[in-house]
Amino acid sequence: MEQDLIIRIIELLGTFAFAISGIRHAAAKRFDWFGGYVCGVAVAIGGGTIRDVMLGTIPFWMTTPIYLICTGVALFTVAFFGKWMEPLKNAWFVFDTLGLALFTIAGIQKSLAFGQPFWVAIIMGCLTGSAGGVIRDVLLNNEPVIFHKEIYAMACVLGGFVYWGLVTLGISAELCAIVSFVITCVIRFLAVKYHISLPVLKENDNSKNI
């Protein structure tokens, strides 16, 4: 399978998963349909747009309307099937995690396709996977998940290093993507299940007197 096609498929799947997550958060805030769609679009294309601008290329969603259509499908999915998905305790979290892993891989692969070194590709993968969530939280007036709670962006970084290691061993791009996807998801699932997070910065008592 051609590299461009792989990236396109991953971006499409990631768009749907992230759009579902963003629209669900908007629904929890009692947004109307338009507000939910805007939130879904922001999550779905935010990270990839920043990545493409930094790579000096046209943002992926501007080359075809399929991504905006996909977000529309996600909106109708939440609007009409959300009540059946609500009893599934972790359904919304799963969509967010799938989007995170898929967009991380898409960011890495696209950066490598543009000839970037691997350390840049990992940063771009992390940006693609997590920036949309930051935009979502800002729109919803929430503290961005990436800055607190369980491991989020670090799951992207670790998944990126796994991808790099497999590529170094000469593994095919398809298998690298699958393994990296699984690892990123597993790290995120375990982090939430066992409340694993990075150390929290604490303000020095002396600084309060300054």
Regions found by a protein language model. Give the residues of each.
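Short, structured motif recognition centered on aromatic/hydrophobic residues
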Residues: 38-42, 49-55, 123, 127, ...
